[in-house]
C-alpha cells in the first residue's frame, strides 16, 4: 500500500514538472508532446495537459486542413502497358519453384544412399497401403 502511494505521489510530481497547473486549473500554456513520433515539420498540432485534480491526462490533437497545392493526384494504372505481375504469372512462378524443389529431391536421395550404403528405397516415404496395415498398438510382450 505504501509503495502504491509513493508511486502515485512521484507520478504526480513528475507530471507537475512537465505540465504546469495554475490555481488548480489547466495551464493556458500547453506543451507539445515529447513522446510524439512525428517529425517537427509535420502538419499536426499535439498538446498535452492535466486536469485540475491531476488524475487525467488530456491530449488535444485537432485535424489540420491541408492546402490543395500540397496534395498530389492518385496515379492511375496504365491498362495497356501494365508491367505489374498478374495472378497467372505469380501462379506460374510458384509452380516452377515447386518443380525445381521436386528435381532437387532426386539427387538428394541418391547422395544419401551412397553416404549410408543403403538402397534408394529406404529414403522414400511409405505409401498409404503400408501405413494402413501397420499396427498402431501392438500387444505387449509378457
UniProtKB/Swiss-Prot annotation:
Localization, UniProt: Mitochondrion
Superkingdom of origin organism: Eukaryota
Principal location: mitochondrion
Transit peptide: 1-31
The keyword Isomerase belongs to this UniProt entry's keyword annotation: no
InterPro entries, per database record: Ribosomal_mL42
Alphabetically ordered keywords of this record: Mitochondrion, Ribonucleoprotein, Ribosomal protein, Transit peptide
GO cellular component: mitochondrial inner membrane; mitochondrial large ribosomal subunit; mitochondrial small ribosomal subunit; mitochondrion; plasma membrane
Biological process (GO), any one: mitochondrial translation
Family named by the database record: Belongs to the mitochondrion-specific ribosomal protein mL42 family.
Assembly with partners or alone: Component of the mitochondrial ribosome large subunit (39S) which comprises a 16S rRNA and about 50 distinct proteins. Component of the mitochondrial ribosome small subunit (28S) which comprises a 12S rRNA and about 30 distinct proteins.
Name of the protein this chain belongs to: Large ribosomal subunit protein mL42
Amino acid at each position: 500500500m505504501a509503495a502504491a502511494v509513493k508511486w502515485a505521489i512521484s507520478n504526480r510530481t513528475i507530471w507537475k514538472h512537465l505540465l504546469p497547473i495554475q490555481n488548480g486549473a489547466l495551464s493556458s500554456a500547453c506543451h507539445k508532446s515529447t513522446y510524439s513520433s512525428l517529425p517537427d515539420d509535420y502538419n499536426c498540432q499535439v498538446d498535452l495537459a492535466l486536469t485540475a485534480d491531476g488524475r487525467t491526462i488530456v491530449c488535444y490533437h485537432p485535424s489540420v486542413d491541408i492546402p490543395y497545392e500540397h496534395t498530389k493526384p492518385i496515379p492511375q494504372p496504365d491498362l495497356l502497358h501494365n508491367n505489374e505481375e498478374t495472378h497467372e504469372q505469380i501462379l506460374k512462378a510458384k509452380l516452377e519453384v515447386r518443380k525445381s524443389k521436386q528435381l532437387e529431391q532426386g539427387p538428394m536421395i541418391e547422395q544419401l544412399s551412397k553416404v549410408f550404403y543403403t538402397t534408394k528405397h529406404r529414403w522414400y516415404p511409405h505409401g498409404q497401403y503400408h501405413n494402413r496395415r501397420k499396427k498402431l498398438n501392438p500387444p505387449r510382450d509378457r
